[in-house]
């Protein structure tokens, strides 16, 4: 609400964080479009912005997503997960690795901090939010090896991420397969899981009556490489490639023309 996400400096104004107005926009003005409240990029030394977002989410009955800003010293995420957020609220950029700015899940000894598992069991949703600067194998690989897997795999698509290590959703899903997840698991975490989180059961599945958003992939076998935001590489043997995309039942992408007739067909 207010001036919105104009930039880092504008996002520091606590007086611009109005829970009642944010909830009003979510429930009365744009209920078909707004699926949650986001707290982002706040530099303050406390959880004021998060608490205001949670208040708005409570009034509107929608989840809250938290993207912690750069804090010096970093704010304690154990307190965030166990005292400030509600079950169903979301922490994004799960596998970012900037410990001087924000606390990370994996400690300096390569171990996932115990309260991370407690928070996930409590119902805190962990979101990848790869982006152009928020995904590092140094956090993701040991986390997954120890059983801490983000609930939602998301791209955070923008020009910085599409031209960096993220590239596109198919590449991102392939990256998680290279880290040990199954094809079925990555699809679930990119479709049905996020649909449930934002309370949109008509999305993310192919049930009768659901929105006809369909992605058809080919699964390539070979020698592939995947990079994080620091250009560190992980090797893999499988890669998904988007063949066909339908949005609301209409073809919007067809890589090899599989839905098209031959040019000389009669």
Feature map (PLM): residue ranges:
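His/Asp/Glu-enriched, well-ordered alpha-helical/loop segment
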Residues: 138-221
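C-terminal cap of metal-dependent C-N hydrolases
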Residues: 211-265
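A short, flexible beta-alpha/helix-coil linker loop
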Residues: 3-4, 97-98, 160
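Histidine/acidic residue-rich metal-binding segments in metalloenzymes
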Residues: 16-126, 134-151
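Metal-cofactor-binding active-site regions of metalloenzymes
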Residues: 1-14, 38-41
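Residue "hotspots" at secondary-structure boundaries inside conserved domains
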Residues: 83, 198, 204-207, 237, ...
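Acidic/histidine-rich helix-loop elements
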Residues: 9-11, 100-101, 164
């Amino acid at each position: 609400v207010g001036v919105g996400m104009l930039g880092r400096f504008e996002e520091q104004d606590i007086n611009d964080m109005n829970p009642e107005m944010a909830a009003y926009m979510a429930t009365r003005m744009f209920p078909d479009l707004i699926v949650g409240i986001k707290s982002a990029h706040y530099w303050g030394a406390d959880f004021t912005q998060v608490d205001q977002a949670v208040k708005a989410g409570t009034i509107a009955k929608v989840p809250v997503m938290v993207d912690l800003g750069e804090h010096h010293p970093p704010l304690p995420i154990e307190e965030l997960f166990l005292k400030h957020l509600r079950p169903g609220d979301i922490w994004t950029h799960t596998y970012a690795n900037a410990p001087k700015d924000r606390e990370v899940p994996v400690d300096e000894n390569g171990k996932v901090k115990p309260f991370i598992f407690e928070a996930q069991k409590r119902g805190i949703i962990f979101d990848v939010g790869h982006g152009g600067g928020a995904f590092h194998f140094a956090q993701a690989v040991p986390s997954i090896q120890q059983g801490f897997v983000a609930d939602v795999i998301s791209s955070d698509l923008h020009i910085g991420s599409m031209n960096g290590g993220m590239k596109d959703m198919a590449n991102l899903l392939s990256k998680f397969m290279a880290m040990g997840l199954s094809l079925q698991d990555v699809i679930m975490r990119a479709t049905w899981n996020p649909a449930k989180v934002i309370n949109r059961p008509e999305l993310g599945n192919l049930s009768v009556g659901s929105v006809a958003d369909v992605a058809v992939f080919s699964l390539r076998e070979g020698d592939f490489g995947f990079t994080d935001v620091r250009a560190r590489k992980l090797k893999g043997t499988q890669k998904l490639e988007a063949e066909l995309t339908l949005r609301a039942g209409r073809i919007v992408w067809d890589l090899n023309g599989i839905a098209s007739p031959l040019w000389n067909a009669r």
